[in-house]
Amino acid sequence: MNEENYLDEIILEMIDQVESPGATGAVEATPEKKRDEIPPEERTIYTGLKIEGLWIEFEERFFLGGRFAMMIPQFFTNMDEESAKIKYPMEQRPETILTDPTGAVNFLLSDLEQEITNDDAEMVRDNLLTIMRRVNPGIRPQSTGKEIIGDKNVAYVEFSNPTMDGKLYNLMFFLEAEGKALMGSFNCPTKSLKYWKKPAFEMMQSLRVIELEIIN
């Protein structure tokens, strides 16, 4: 399979999935008076966030054999294989599929196996967004942009897409790591967008690429 067909398969299968948003689930941490005293506008994923009335703690986790790190909600767990096969039925599923207890809020991470440079992140995003919109006209891009995180160019796109149970909000981002393209994707029901948009961006901004040292 050539590189273009491989990328097309990943994108087509991901956007063709049937999601079941449901209510956002979370594990409530014990509120502390000191934490409650932090003004809402000053709360971040590093202080803990109150989302839909529940305190959510975040922690840094490592992925892709320790090559990539990112802050993730503590209650996110690996999606079980049965659910992953239903939601992401393609043969080449994302290496990382994390979800909340209800399966409504998800984070995915994929090595696209495409050779790129640090300057190509926006090109990869634009090409894949074109593919996605061509096969799914229901996709509604909301914004695109680029942030420099560490020394990496990280290109992102926000969009919504319809599902059988309602619309999903997606924050998808692309970057180079060890010469290959990585794609991260956060999604949640649009009805939960006001709670999750800020932490979704903070999660993206927390990413770290750990370059492996070559020992001669």
Features from the language model and the residues they span:
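A short, hydrophobic, proline-anchored segment that marks a local hinge/packing element in signaling
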Residues: 172-176
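Short beta-strand segments that buttress and anchor functional surface loops
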Residues: 155-163
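N-terminal targeting sequences that direct proteins away from the cytosol to non-cytosolic compartments
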Residues: 1-108, 113-119, 127, 131-140, ...
